[in-house]
Amino acid sequence: MPWWTDALYWLPRGVSWSDMYNKTTEPGYMYPHYSHLWMTVLTGISLIIYRFVFENYIFVPLAHFLSRKNPPETRRGTLDREKKYSRMAECAMRALYYTISFVCGLYLVLHESHLYDITECWRNWPFHPIPNAVAWYYWIQGGFYIALVFGILFLDAKRSDFWQMLVHHFITLALIGVSWTMNMVRVGTLILVSHDAVDILIDVGKILRYEQFETALTICFAGVLFVWVATRLVYYPFWIIRSVWFDAPALIQDDYEWLNFDQQPQAPRFIMLLLTALLILHIFWAYILFKIAYDTIQEGVVDDVREDFDEQSLVNREKAKQQNKNKDD
């Protein structure tokens, strides 16, 4: 086996891979193994197919049906509308997935002790047998982020935060892979569930924006701001990261020092690096959200600065700003 797979770099002092893998479990439970990560690749391929089918054969035709009473008058209008339908279908596909994922994830952790006492993520770690349903939840989540990376690189229109989104998805995939290998699945599920909540509202808000439902969009955007701050700027750093930094060493290896890089294992430091990078991205997007909120108050237009760099969207934005300026005059 490669040197980097040595348990010395991954597990607490005195614990080997065989100690975990040879543990017997009750029916319906399992211990994670890195070989299981192939399931994320298979589910990723399945979700790419799911996206193609749902977008092209369900959501785009549905958008056509709902807009049939207002046909475009020009060829340019037809092209613009088809482009809008495609983007709405993309948002609808993601919103549907996030909704199902959030509901299922919440159901899986709702009766688990570590949802209410996060120190249960570390007590007796890594000897935490994982319910098969949680394993599938983890694999599907990993597969979904593989599908998102594929979409960003080959399918989606390029957005202003293209690189940030790509980095975010790779960080998430790395966290899923490493946490599965180390059996830090308990804390991983808490992160995934809490992050899915706001993603539902973001994609629903984009659909409302495309359809120009201004009142509903404003309400949805207020919900995005509230849930974003609650889950990604409060719960994530002050509950999850704080527990990883303080509780985990105290309950697993009490002499562990994060900044003593000669001390093993090293994998927790890699996880902390990824968690911190994710938090930085959360702060970056929070800045964008509050910028949108400020512009909305000043100009009366809820606009998503993450939308596509295309001539038409820029023209529409400038028109809206000019109209509001004329009203003020």
Swiss-Prot record:
Q: What enzyme category does the UniProt record give?
A: transferase
Q: Which UniProt keywords apply?
A: Glycoprotein, Lipid biosynthesis, Lipid metabolism, Membrane, Sphingolipid metabolism, Transferase, Transmembrane, Transmembrane helix
Listed EC numbers: 2.3.1.297
Q: Which residues form the TLC domain?
A: 86-298
Look up keyword ATP-binding and say if it applies.
no
Q: Which InterPro entries match?
A: Lag1/Lac1-like, TLC-dom
The residues the entry assigns to the signal sequence are none
In this protein, the residues bearing a glycan are N22
> What follows loss of this gene?
Animals deficient in HYL-2 show inability to adapt to oxygen deprivation as a result from the loss of ceramide synthase function.
**Could you say which tissues express the protein in this record?**
Strong expression in the gut, the posterior bulb of the pharynx, the hypoderm, and unidentified cells of the head and the tail.
Mainly localized where? membrane
Membrane topology type: Multi-pass membrane protein
Keyword check for Coiled coil: no
Its pathway?
Lipid metabolism; sphingolipid metabolism
Q: Where in the cell is it found?
A: Membrane
- Per its record, what are the GO molecular function terms? transferase activity
A GO cellular component term found in this entry reads:
membrane
Q: Which residues cross the membrane?
A: 41-61, 95-115, 134-154, 162-182, 187-207, 221-241, 270-290
What the entry lists under PROSITE patterns is as follows: TLC
**What reactions does this protein catalyze?**
a very long-chain fatty acyl-CoA + a sphingoid base = an N-(very-long-chain fatty acyl)-sphingoid base + CoA + H(+); a fatty acyl-CoA + sphinganine = an N-acylsphinganine + CoA + H(+); docosanoyl-CoA + sphinganine = N-docosanoylsphinganine + CoA + H(+); sphinganine + tetradecanoyl-CoA = N-(tetradecanoyl)-sphinganine + CoA + H(+)
GO BP terms: namely: ceramide biosynthetic process
Please report which protein family the annotation says this sequence is part of.
Belongs to the sphingosine N-acyltransferase family.
Stated role = Catalyzes the acylation of sphingoid bases to form ceramides, which are key players in cell signaling events such as tolerances to heat, oxidation, and ultraviolet stress. C.elegans contain specific sphingoid bases, which are unique or different in structure compared to the sphingoid bases found in other animals. Two examples of these distinctive compounds are: 15-methylhexadecasphinganine and 15-methylhexadecasphing-4-enine. Exhibits substrate preference for long and very long fatty acyl-coA chains (C20-23). Required for adaptation of the nematode to anoxia.
* Name the record gives this protein: Ceramide synthase hyl-2
Upper lineage: Eukaryota, Metazoa, Ecdysozoa, Nematoda, Chromadorea
Q: Which gene encodes it?
A: hyl-2
